[in-house]
């Protein structure tokens, strides 16, 4: 498997269950080592530790990523400049400001998802990896998630999205990688489908 995940672009990874999407995410963000080959960043081979430092990961099960007692506290984990006015703006950007002092674990699934994506954005990491970021998100907030991922990419991050949602992938991907049991195909924006 050979792929590039360009800074400033959104790459969606799609494929059937069991083809290795989760394994690929784990390797990319440094939670697992590749079984063979290397992973490079800026042309340099990277260690797992370097990849972990470069990546912000949004897992599908967002409840496992909530650690603070407050919404703003979630934003400041790994991003000390996301408090005060910056934190309030970020919460407003994700339609969460009205939730005030609610405990993060008391939020709905879609609200938790938006909070964790906001926290990933607040880190300013070079690579943002999201596993099924639209799960639990209602249609009203899908456009907001797409716009946010676009903003994160425009700020210079490589955004990598694992999704089963073909419509979402079509709406936001600059590059689509489809994994199959026999390999992978890659289509870039503007390529014939």
Where are these regions (language model features)?
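The feature captures the beta-strand-to-loop junction immediately N-terminal to the Walker
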Residues: 14-16
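Helix-to-loop junction immediately C-terminal to a conserved catalytic motif
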Residues: 29
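Conserved ABC transporter NBD signature motif
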Residues: 37-53
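Conserved ABC ATPase "signature" region
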Residues: 84-99
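Conserved ABC ATPase signature
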Residues: 103-107, 111
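ABC ATPase C-loop
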Residues: 120-122
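Catalytic Walker B motif of ABC-type/P-loop ATPase nucleotide-binding domains
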Residues: 128-131
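ABC-family nucleotide-binding domains
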Residues: 138
